[in-house]
């Protein structure tokens, strides 16, 4: 019986992979990933067993990984962040449902951007928080507005993914809704290109959100009413 590992690789930095992930990637027969992840790992692992394709060819990548596992191979398919958070884990599990007696599947967690970004900012998620995607592909506009209204009133800390995908239109909507219920001085943090050479960290306020500074690699953290900035560079939500 073949085995399929569905692995989250965080931001693609080798040094932030879990030891479990490194051991699996050294042992499997094949590794499927997108071209960006391929570029990150082809020097750390045997590139002859890595099969990379275009980022937007997710469906084909999943199908090929499943087919290889059905042929009896031990296979890994990689996704950024954690594959169970806006990732490929659900795609794989839905597609192999009828083959569960022929493939052994393991979901291997990765460090999602909410966690790695929070660590760079300080400790913005000490209390309850929500994670919301602003992706045009995943976010139904009407449902998104309803979610944002509820979250704005709740005073939860919020992490926004895909804030510029493909435009900042949904980000503008989100900010305007939050400003209806929260102080314009609410602390926000933006992390871009986490643990990469062009990494950028920004601290600001909800009213002064720098739209011109965000891109497809940015994650937005919105604090609650207790969130503050220490020493002009650390974002903290007090525990007590």
Locate the predicted segments by residue:
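Class I SAM-dependent methyltransferase SAM-binding "motif I" and its flanking Rossmann-like core
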Residues: 19, 85, 89-157
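Short gly/pro/ser/thr-enriched loop/turn and capping motifs at secondary-structure boundaries
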Residues: 38-40, 58-59, 112-115, 137-139, ...
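Fold-independent oxyanion-binding glycine-rich loops
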Residues: 9-11, 33-36, 53-55, 80-82, ...
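Short gly/ser/thr-rich secondary-structure transition/capping motifs
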Residues: 9-16, 138-141, 202-204
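Class I S-adenosyl-L-methionine
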Residues: 1-14, 19-105
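A contiguous loop/helix-start segment that scaffolds small-molecule binding in enzyme catalytic cores
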Residues: 4, 153-240
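A polyampholytic, Gly/Pro-enriched intrinsically disordered region
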Residues: 73-79, 124-134, 154, 206-216
């Amino acid at each position: 019986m073949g085995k399929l590992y569905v692995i989250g690789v965080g931001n693609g930095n080798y040094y932030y992979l879990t030891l479990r992930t490194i051991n699996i990637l050294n042992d499997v027969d094949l590794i499927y990933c997108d071209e960006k992840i391929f570029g990150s790992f082809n020097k750390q692992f045997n590139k002859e067993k890595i099969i990379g394709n275009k980022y937007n060819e997710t469906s084909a990548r999943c199908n090929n990984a499943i087919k290889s596992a059905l042929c009896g191979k031990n296979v890994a398919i990689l996704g950024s962040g954690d594959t169970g958070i806006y990732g490929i884990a659900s795609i794989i599990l839905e597609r192999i449902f009828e083959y569960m007696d022929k493939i052994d599947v393991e979901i291997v967690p990765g460090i999602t951007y909410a966690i790695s970004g929070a660590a760079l900012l300080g400790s913005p998620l000490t209390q309850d928080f929500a994670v919301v995607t602003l992706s045009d592909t995943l976010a139904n506009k009407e449902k998104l507005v309803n979610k944002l209204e509820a979250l704005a009133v709740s005073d939860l800390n919020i992490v926004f993914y895909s804030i510029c995908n493909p435009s900042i239109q949904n980000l503008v909507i989100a900010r305007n809704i939050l400003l209806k219920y929260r102080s314009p001085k609410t602390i926000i943090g933006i992390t871009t290109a986490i643990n990469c050479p062009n990494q950028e960290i920004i601290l600001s306020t909800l009213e002064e959100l720098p739209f011109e500074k965000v891109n497809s690699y940015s994650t937005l953290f919105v604090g609650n009413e207790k969130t503050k900035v220490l020493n002009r560079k650390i974002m903290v939500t007090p525990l007590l």
